[in-house]
Regions:
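Non-transmembrane, aqueous-exposed alpha-helical and coiled segments at domain scale
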Residues: 1-350
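Domain-level signature for proteins that mediate thiol-based redox and metal-cofactor handling
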Residues: 39, 348-438
Length: 438
């Protein structure tokens, strides 16, 4: 690994059951077996990112634990994340800690809300993130299961989310184990979700949505796509949605997962994605008479009832977010309602730029500048994302005990920086610690 790990280590029996029992006793897990986060597993994950293990992504709620890359890697190792998928886990947490996602409220509410990860980009298949039949459960893609689980474990073990204590969720939901799926981009007639967020189509992007659950919709009767869209809108506007608890419907987003067969039909009936979204918004309402008197009173006080006695769910069409995924069986859609307190967030995935092998080779060459004088260079820290390396000059050879024969640090530094910049193929911020300087 690039630097020595800071986390303490434990020695236990080489038995999966032993670690499983330990994880249950310590409260690290979610009730399902975990993989032991061995040095080898954690190191393999760390080599997949350009970030230093000590780099902090942010503070994870609810207890504001510092999410260092090392701690994220430990939890990802327990979840079974493959090294190639680790940068996606980091990107998801980068999105999660943004204030707009409001993760502190999400992790402590009585609601069942939990982050859902939606992935776009060319790595979907390589990482085995499901987007066809069974993509929201049952397809068994390793990426789908482990990436979402890693984020949940980080909230538990780094953020301190504990059911019944810091988390007051009344019911929870299956997605609290972890929910991650991808968009079936090749079957979508519209720009991808990532493109709509401003990313290029060839970028790997993860989008976080605060989802209250997965609500299935089925229609075996309507052949007309506009009638189908009408019924879909009515289902989304269910009477006790969180949107009807707010002063306005101008909050959060609702993800509408549409199977490829329905998506093709909607694309023929509506000229653009925006016109389809506007049609859904226009018909996502219920008559005020649907509610009981106590509900009606609150809705009227909040000025949610229009002149025709309709209560619209959302204010803007872009709050209804179609995503194409699922099998080819048609007949079904799924919508993921928001709890209205989180704004959907997207982040690009960044892989490693310096591998451990590349850095080791660069350091080996740099060490030749001082070893002939009986000195050495010790790596203290490396942060590829920031282009920063911290080295310590070690003088220990008895023939040069005072270090007088070794060039001063201020003279050595530009020579070492030149070697590292050339081997690492980029500008470098080098700090050289010379213990001979008081």
């Amino acid at each position: 690994v690039i630097v020595q790990l800071a986390s303490p280590t434990l020695e236990i029996d080489d038995d999966p059951e032993a670690f499983f029992q330990l994880s249950l006793a310590e409260g690290w897990g979610d009730g399902a077996p975990l993989l032991p986060p061995t040095d080898e597993r954690v190191a393999a994950l760390l080599e997949a990112t350009a970030l230093a293990p000590s780099h902090t992504i942010g503070k994870l709620p609810p207890r504001h634990g510092a999410a260092t890359v090392e701690l994220i890697a430990i939890n990802a190792a327990m979840a079974g994340v493959e090294p190639a998928a680790f940068p996606l886990v980091i990107a998801a947490l980068e999105a999660l800690v943004r204030p707009e996602f409001n993760a502190i409220a999400l992790t402590t509410t009585t609601s069942s809300v939990h982050p859902t990860l939606i992935v776009n980009g060319p790595s979907r298949d390589k990482l085995r993130i499901d987007y066809q039949a069974g993509c929201l459960g049952g397809a068994a893609g390793r990426g789908s299961m482990t990436i979402g689980r890693a984020v949940s474990l980080c909230l538990r073990n780094v953020g301190g989310q504990r059911t019944g204590a810091t988390s007051r969720s009344v019911f929870g939901q299956p997605a609290r184990f972890g929910q991650c799926f991808a968009e079936w981009e090749e079957r979508s007639p519209w720009p991808t979700l990532a493109e709509r967020q401003g990313f290029a189509r060839d970028r790997d992007v993860v989008t976080l949505h605060g989802s209250k659950g997965n609500f299935p919709v089925a229609d075996t009767n309507n052949d007309d796509p506009r009638d189908l869209a009408y019924m879909l809108a009515k289902c989304i506007a269910y009477p006790l949605s969180n949107y009807y608890l707010e002063l306005t419907g101008d909050c959060g987003q609702i993800v509408v997962v549409i199977n490829p067969m329905w998506a093709a039909r909607f694309a023929k009936a509506f000229a653009t994605l925006e016109s389809f979204q506007e049609y859904l918004r226009e018909h996502a309402w219920q008559p005020i008479e649907l509610w009981r008197p106590a509900n009606q009173e609150v809705l009227r006080k909040k000025n949610r009832v229009d002149a025709r006695g309709r209560v619209h769910l959302v204010n803007r069409p872009e709050q209804l977010v179609p995503v194409v995924a699922g099998g080819l069986g048609s007949l079904h859609a799924m919508f993921l309602p928001s709890w209205c307190q989180s704004e959907m967030q997207s982040a690009a995935v960044h892989g490693a730029t310096w591998t451990a092998e590349l850095l080791d080779a660069a350091l080996d060459e740099a060490r030749t500048l001082v070893r002939s004088d009986g000195a050495d260079l010790l790596l203290v820290e490396a942060d590829p994302a920031a282009g920063r390396v911290v080295l310590r000059l070690e003088v220990g050879d008895e023939t040069c005990a005072t270090g007088a024969c070794v060039m001063p640090g201020e003279a050595l530094r530009p020579m070492i920086a030149d070697v590292l910049s050339r081997r690492l193929r980029g500008a470098l911020d080098l700090q050289l610690i010379d213990p001979r300087r008081g």
